[in-house]
């Protein structure tokens, strides 16, 4: 049995699609998860959540209270479409407005951590100017988050700008703000030429949550657990021995599968078995 002190969550996109959060949280509870991570991506459907009415926001809060399944984090990837670094002032302003709305939304519904995607640009060519604008955009975003007491946490990415904890720590030191931390993805971290265990140890004290998925070099999504390059047992051991006690989030994109719940159960059992081998079990 996993330790009660190890919060284990599931990504929203692993579960059946839809906008009923009461149903989603009930299913997550049935599957044995402690929390669900919300996605606000670049689609109009998920972006519209940031414009939810007071009644809609209260419905989410009530679903959390009724089920006991938390929604403590948001994966905010909408800035791929509306980059904070855009040379188009209107697009950049829209990106900052998305950040402002996301922080306000988090404050309203109890989300503690907003995971940021470490792209300066996604659909354009990066250069020194986009990197500079990225730093400036982060600085402005963290100032907003500080006032709201919401943590912004940088994901380790499938993109060279932010493909290691060491690189993300550079931004943490540059910003020097307790409301900016790290949210590593052990799959992305392992797919690059990183000393994964050293990187994880270097991040301790700044890591607020961990994404769990498998990857291969150049393949960052939809790699079945056990078929990629991630040494899960060693990663879990390193995090445990380094004193990390925070949440783990199984990241999957099975919402359109024939039976998403079955896919999630299979993955969850696999991950829990590796956690058990790493000594992350409840004392008898």
Swiss-Prot record:
Q: Reaction(s) catalyzed by this protein?
A: L-ribulose 5-phosphate = L-xylulose 5-phosphate
| Gene3D superfamilies registered for this protein in UniProt | Divalent-metal-dependent TIM barrel enzymes
InterPro entries from the entry? L-Ru-5P_3-Epase, L-Ru-5P_3-Epase_Enterobacteria, Sugar_Epim/Isomerase, Xyl_isomerase-like_sf, Xyl_isomerase-like_TIM-brl
Question: Do you know what upregulates this one?
Answer: Induced by L-ascorbate. Repressed by UlaR.
Q: Which Pfam families match?
A: AP_endonuc_2
Keyword Isomerase attributed:
yes
Respond yes or no to whether keyword Isomerase is given for this record: yes
UniProt GO MF annotations? intramolecular oxidoreductase activity, interconverting aldoses and ketoses; L-ribulose-5-phosphate 3-epimerase activity
Q: Name one GO biological process term.
A: L-ascorbic acid catabolic process
Question: Keywords in UniProt for this one?
Answer: Isomerase
Coiled-coil blocks: none
Q: Which SUPFAM superfamilies has this protein been placed in?
A: Xylose isomerase-like
Q: In which pathway does it act?
A: Cofactor degradation; L-ascorbate degradation; D-xylulose 5-phosphate from L-ascorbate: step 3/4
Enzyme nomenclature, EC number: 5.1.3.22
Q: Where is the signal peptide?
A: none
Q: Which NCBIfam families does this entry report, sorted A to Z?
A: hxl6Piso_put, PRK13209.1, PRK13210.1
Family that this chain belongs to = Belongs to the L-ribulose-5-phosphate 3-epimerase family.
Q: What does this protein do?
A: Catalyzes the isomerization of L-xylulose-5-phosphate to L-ribulose-5-phosphate. Is involved in the anaerobic L-ascorbate utilization.
Q: What is this protein called?
A: L-ribulose-5-phosphate 3-epimerase UlaE
Q: What is the lineage of its organism?
A: Bacteria, Pseudomonadati, Pseudomonadota, Gammaproteobacteria, Enterobacterales
């Amino acid at each position: 049995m996993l330790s009660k002190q190890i919060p284990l969550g599931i990504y929203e996109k692993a579960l059946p699609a839809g906008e009923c959060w009461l149903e989603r949280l009930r299913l997550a509870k049935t599957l044995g998860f402690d929390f669900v991570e919300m996605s606000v991506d670049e689609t109009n459907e998920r972006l519209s959540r940031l414009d939810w009415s007071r009644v809609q926001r209260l419905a989410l809060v009530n679903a959390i209270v009724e089920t006991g399944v938390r929604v403590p984090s948001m994966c905010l990837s909408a800035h791929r479409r509306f980059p904070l670094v855009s040379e188009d002032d209107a697009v950049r302003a829209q990106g900052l407005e998305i950040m402002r709305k996301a922080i306000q939304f988090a404050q309203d519904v109890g989300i503690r951590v907003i995971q940021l995607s470490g792209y300066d640009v996604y659909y354009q060519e990066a250069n020194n100017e986009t990197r500079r604008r990225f730093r400036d955009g982060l600085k402005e975003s963290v100032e907003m988050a500080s006032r709201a007491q919401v943590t912004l946490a940088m994901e380790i990415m499938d993109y060279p700008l932010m493909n290691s904890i060491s690189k993300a720590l550079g931004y943490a030191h540059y910003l020097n703000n307790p409301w900016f931390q790290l949210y590593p993805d052990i799959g992305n971290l392992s797919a690059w030429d990183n000393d994964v265990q050293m990187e994880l140890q270097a991040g301790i004290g700044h890591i607020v949550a961990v994404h769990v998925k498998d990857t291969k070099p150049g393949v960052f999504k939809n790699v079945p657990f056990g078929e990629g390059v991630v040494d899960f047992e060693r990663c879990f051991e390193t995090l445990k021995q380094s004193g990390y006690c925070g949440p783990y989030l199984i990241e999957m994109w099975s919402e359109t599968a024939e039976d998403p719940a079955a896919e999630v159960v299979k993955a969850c059992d696999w991950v829990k078995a590796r956690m058990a081998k790493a000594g992350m079990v409840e004392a008898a």
